[in-house]
Design a protein with these regions (language model features):
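Short, helix-capping/interhelical loops that line the mouth of catalytic, cofactor-
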Residues: 1-17, 62-134, 194-226
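Generic structural signal for well-ordered, non-transmembrane alpha-helical segments
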Residues: 17-20, 24, 57-60, 112-115, ...
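Helix-loop segments that flank and shape redox-cofactor active sites
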Residues: 24-53, 69-83, 95-100, 124-170
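Short, solvent-exposed loop/helix junctions and linker helices
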Residues: 46-49, 104, 111, 179
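Extended cationic-aromatic binding surfaces that line active-site or macromolecule-binding grooves
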Residues: 50-64
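Acidic, Ser/Thr-rich low-complexity intrinsically disordered segments
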Residues: 158-163, 177, 221-226
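A hydrophobic membrane-anchoring alpha-helix module
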Residues: 175-197
């Protein structure tokens, strides 16, 4: 591609540089935790119903479920980046929006799956121009949670003619959605660690669904769950 074409049609990666470090943020927060911490849950807060292990598993699943589960026909017309059998382990029918626990239980296995999902994401970010990403759309089912989540999207969200609701997103908004999911679930992991008296490791950017007005983003008191 000529230099003029590179200038006029920049890669989508230029909008999302954090994809080149986001899996390392996850790894930094969870890799040294023992099983008691990884599997701690509480019904005291809505965000603590899922354990740190489950939050991490969910993050590994999100990019794959979106980029392959919803975008495959537009992004991977020639060959999918993983087999259908492999995909089914990232979108387990027996585990809610996360990896198959039977195959991904040890935290290092889950983190390797996060790496795999982000690798696929980066391939798309490099192979797709911003112009093309703005011309592509998929739609999701309407929900009360999505009505709150979409308020943090400055653009890329449009009307679904079938439902009359703002539930369609272009590829830019999809990558922003995945990134917001990561930020918010890392934030949840940090909240769990604070509640257990463990210092968080990474500094998150000022972004994520937990920044939406109306989202429960209250941080627990240090060691509050002990």
């Amino acid at each position: 591609m000529s230099q003029s074409n590179l200038t006029s049609t920049p890669q989508l990666r230029t909008m999302f540089p954090d994809y080149w470090r986001i899996n390392s943020l996850v790894r930094a927060e969870v890799s040294e935790l023992d099983d008691a911490v990884l599997d701690w849950t509480s019904d005291r807060w809505g965000w603590s119903v899922w354990s740190i292990r489950q939050q991490t598993s969910h993050m590994a699943s999100v990019p794959v479920r979106w980029l392959i589960g919803k975008w495959a026909d537009q992004l991977f017309s020639d060959k999918l980046p993983m087999s259908p059998e492999r995909y089914s382990t990232f979108d387990s029918t027996e585990h809610d929006r996360r990896l198959d626990d039977r195959l991904f239980w040890h935290i290092e296995e889950i983190l390797n799956a996060v790496d795999e999902a982000i690798y696929i994401s980066k391939r798309v970010l490099v192979d797709t121009t911003i112009h093309k990403a703005r011309s592509m759309f998929v739609c999701r089912a309407p929900s009360d949670q999505w009505n709150l989540m979409r308020t943090v999207h400055p653009d890329g969200i449009s009307l679904d003619p079938k439902t009359g609701q703002m539930t369609c997103k272009d590829l830019v908004a999809t990558f922003r959605h995945i990134q917001n999911e990561f930020y918010t679930h890392i934030f949840n992991i940090q909240r769990a660690k604070l509640a257990l008296g463990i210092e968080p490791i990474v500094k998150l950017p000022d972004a994520g669904y937990h920044k939406a007005v109306g989202w429960d983003s209250k941080v627990p008191i240090w060691n509050e769950a002990r």
